[in-house]
Regions:
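An aromatic- and histidine-rich active-site surface loop
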Residues: 16-26, 35-58, 64-73
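Nucleotide-sugar-dependent
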Residues: 180, 226, 231-237, 245-265, ...
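Nucleotide-activated donor-binding/catalytic signature segment of Leloir-type glycosyltransferases, i.e.
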Residues: 201, 210-236
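Nucleotide-sugar donor phosphate/pyrophosphate-binding loop at the beta->alpha transition
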Residues: 17-18, 58-62, 73-95, 132
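A charged, aromatic-enriched C-terminal amphipathic alpha-helix characteristic of glycosyltransferases
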Residues: 295-296, 300, 308-343
Length: 350
């Protein structure tokens, strides 16, 4: 283990120093190793600089960068991105990507923001293991395929028919931090709530929880906050009450896929989405929810209501779970590693 400098705030000088210190210590340890491959997960961006130096010192070592998040781009704020400290922070990553034999990104969308040759890039979506004890609900007109976890009691989706549900239950999963679009979520729920009753189930916690609760209450939106939930069975039971999963972040945040959306895919919750790139295209092409636009909020709410009234929800649930198995299950990630990473060990660095 490497001792790391502790920090409290998500965005702070102390956190940046902690990451710099970790990269420095990791580099010193790796200098003493005879490694066939160095696989570095970014951020911290300072690891990219360390990897570049190690690559030059360890000539025959294969270097792989795996970019799980773009910092500082994912923090949002166009004005912030132009400030010198943020430009320097970004260049800590970008100026050293050329040293890698392969650059893996968490989604295709990230590749628009990095300077890496296409033939030296690959996409590995963040995998989620199939939870034990759940199976895919197969529509009557579909042939059975791989087993996918869904709660057997379909209290929300299974009973959805051609009539408007008395209450539309939404799920929000994940951190309640400074980059989620609290105003967008609240506005959308308020508009939808004028057409039918709505209820929000919040699975997660964070520094903006109080603000989220206050804004929901001020608009008369009923909600229940469960805090952070780590038990898969508990999370599945909460999701079984919900009809849609909310996947919304502030405009300008550089994210193409969220971990919460992978859970929604796993449990077959159609998306209320404003995330660009990979997720936006999946929703659009596969018709697995609605892509929310603030300038067309009323139209989006009407589209959601039409979907809630339709008989397509079981079909969408099945489609989302099939996409989960194809794109986001552990096996999908392992296939990319076998096809793109392991051959580098056999042939050595390019």
């Amino acid at each position: 283990y490497i001792d790391a400098v502790p920090y409290r705030k998500n965005l702070s000088v102390r956190r940046l120093y902690s990451q710099y210190d970790f990269a420095r210590k990791a580099e010193k340890i790796l200098e003493k190793e005879q490694a066939d491959m160095v696989y570095m997960i970014l951020p911290a961006n300072s690891l990219a600089a360390a990897g570049d130096r190690l690559k030059r010192k360890m000539n025959r070592t294969v270097l792989v960068f795996d970019i799980l998040d773009l910092w500082p781009e994912s923090l949002g704020g166009k004005k912030l991105q132009k400030l010198w400290p943020f430009q320097y922070w970004r260049r800590l990553r970008d100026d050293h990507l050329k040293a890698a034999d392969l650059v893996i990104t968490e989604c295709h969308y990230f590749q628009k923001f990095i300077n890496a040759k296409q033939e030296k890039t690959a996409v590995v979506y963040w995998p989620k293991e199939v939870p034990e004890g759940w199976k895919m609900e197969i529509p009557e007109n579909e042939a059975p395929e791989n087993q996918v976890p869904v709660p057997e009691p379909q209290t929300a989706l299974g009973n959805a028919g051609v009539n408007t549900p008395a209450v539309i239950h939404f799920a929000y999963l994940g951190s309640i931090n400074n980059i989620i679009d609290i105003d967008g979520i609240v506005n959308f729920l308020e508009i939808t709530g004028k057409m039918t009753s709505v209820f929000l189930h919040v699975v997660g916690d964070g520094e903006n929880r109080g603000l989220f609760e206050e804004k929901l209450k001020s608009r008369g939106i009923k909600a229940e906050f469960y805090g952070a939930v780590y038990e898969e069975a508990v999370k599945a039971e909460i999701f079984s009450r919900c009809m849609f999963g909310i996947n919304m972040m502030k405009p300008g945040v550089c994210v193409g896929l969220t971990m919460k959306s992978i859970d929604y895919f796993c449990y077959g919750l159609p998306l209320v989405n404003n995330i660009p790139g990979d997720t936006w295209e999946l929703v659009k092409q596969e018709q697995i929810g609605i892509n929310y636009r603030p300038d067309a909020a009323l139209k989006c709410a009407q589209e959601l209501l039409e979907l809630a009234q339709s008989d397509r929800l079981k079909e969408i649930k099945y489609k989302m779970q099939s996409l989960y198995m194809k794109l986001f299950a552990q096996e999908a990630a392992e296939n990319v590693i076998r096809e793109r990473v392991l051959p580098l060990l056999e042939g050595g660095p390019k």
